[in-house]
Amino acid sequence: FFASCDGNDKEDVNPAELNSVIVNYSFIQSDDVVDFYDVIVSYGIDEEEANCDTVGFDGWTMEINYGVGEPTVPNKVYCKAIMTPKAQLPTIDLEKKYSFKVDYNMNVIGCRNDGQTTILKMVSNTNPNIANMPGNKVQEYLDKGEQIIVDFSHEIK
């Protein structure tokens, strides 16, 4: 008679099933974005109310482990970042080149019951087309108003 190390009274656990999900978000933006825009990131899971943070000069990074100690892994993770022109804008120097660049990375990693991890989704982007904007184009860019940087969601399967 042989007994398993973790006991026979436990329910059978599927080793490949996810027991938690780690989500990494990061945003890095140029100083001009921070000077001219308010950048707000909202993030969360499923249909829960979003958490909101402001992105500053140092950027914004968040790592969240969903599912640990919870009865289930979330069905969906999401993150949305919006930049809105500030109410009080700095003076635009028409001779200067401006950079309205925002880089972001988002990774969703599944942690399985057997201890293995798997990448469920990876997203990264940069917008180099607005890295060298002439000063005489800045007001036109600001007049676009609120801009969505990213609207990301991923269903966990």
List each language-model region with its residue ranges.
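Exposed beta-strand and adjacent loop surfaces of beta-rich binding modules
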Residues: 20-22, 36-40, 97-103
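Tryptophan-paired
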Residues: 44-85
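Noncatalytic modules at the cell exterior or secretory-pathway interfaces
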Residues: 17-29, 72-83
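Bacterial Sec-dependent N-terminal signal peptides
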Residues: 1-24
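Extracytoplasmic electrostatic interaction patches
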Residues: 75-157
